[in-house]
Amino acid sequence: MNVIGVVGLPASGKGEFSKIAEGLGIPVVVMGDVIRNAVKKAGLPPTDENLGAMANRLRAERGMDAIAILCVDAVKEQKARLVLIDGIRGDAEVRVFREHFPGFRLIAIETSFEKRLSRLCERKRSDDVGSAEGLLTRDKRELGWGLGNALQLADIRLNNDGSLEEFTARVTDLIHSMEREP
């Protein structure tokens, strides 16, 4: 089994990458689901503030790699040649996946601040921030988890400042090439 991970700042296109992969039949393990489930169990609404606080709590109580460790079994349960992990936020998580999955490769999605802000304002998800200040705050929080270090560890970089069609073509080509690998 080949395992790849996707990393990027908020609204860079990680979720879109995952949708494209799923459309190609690639199983996706979403790290954020661990956090969303913990927020739900706590009886809280899935706002950006609650999700961020829960992620901070899990990392404070169990270590910066806690969420990755909770996802390892879900990845191992997949019966596919290629599996995607969505939502990597730090270098500690990258280390966990490289330890458990030889040949693990990390894909960084790179997108300008302006494009990311525009996307956040358009998609209106419950955990989205709708202002430049809110996005800067979210970026700072995630960079504090080691996201900048994780981005530096990327094996592959994909720019996502263009159209959805351009990004879809790049992701599709990349996934098809990875599916052909032993």
Curated annotation (Swiss-Prot):
ATP binds at G8, L9, P10, A11, S12, G13, K14, G15. One of its GO terms (molecular function) is ATP binding. Belongs to the UPF0200 family. The keyword Cell membrane does not apply. Keywords: ATP-binding, Nucleotide-binding. This is UPF0200 protein Mboo_1593. InterPro entries: NTP_hydrolase-rel (IPR022970), P-loop_NTPase (IPR027417). The keyword Transferase does not apply. Pfam families: AAA_17. The lineage of its organism: Archaea, Methanobacteriati, Methanobacteriota, Stenosarchaea group, Methanomicrobia.
